[in-house]
Amino acid sequence: IADRVEQMVLDVTARIKELRKQGVSLSNLYVFGLGDIVEGCGEHYAMQTFSIEYDLRRQKMIARRLLVKAIRTWAPMFNNVVVACVPGNHGENRKNGKSFTTFGDNFDVSIFDEAQEIFAENNKFKHVKFIIPENDLWLTLDISGTIVGLAHGHQFRTGGRYSHQKAVSWLSGQ
């Protein structure tokens, strides 16, 4: 996965340059983390403990380094950068198969907290803003007059046979 993310950073960079060559004006960048950035080490399904490659510390380290690398690569190309995230179910702090603390006590979100602290230390990245929910499983952003909602798919448990039906059902109840 790390190799694919590193390739994605290069591909996005190339696409930005390509669009600008075509005359497309790009001044704002939005980077979203939609959860499950880490797999966790157990408590989600029976085989999880035996199917992961890295312990939780290493998973968080790899995810943080990839996120920071992406932002460091892209941020100098934009006037404004907004980085936002929502928690996923695999990032939950779990015990005996259940999330036992707050929604905000989530490894997916803590990776973004750590990245925010890293970028806050460097004046070169003052144009990078982070939006990190304190204890919500979702957030909304106004992007150039369009309200955009972010939520991880584990919110959509009921409301239809297909995932898009479940998402619409969940959204209508908000």
Annotate each PLM feature.
Residues I1-Q174:
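Extended recognition/assembly regions associated with phosphoester-bond processing machinery
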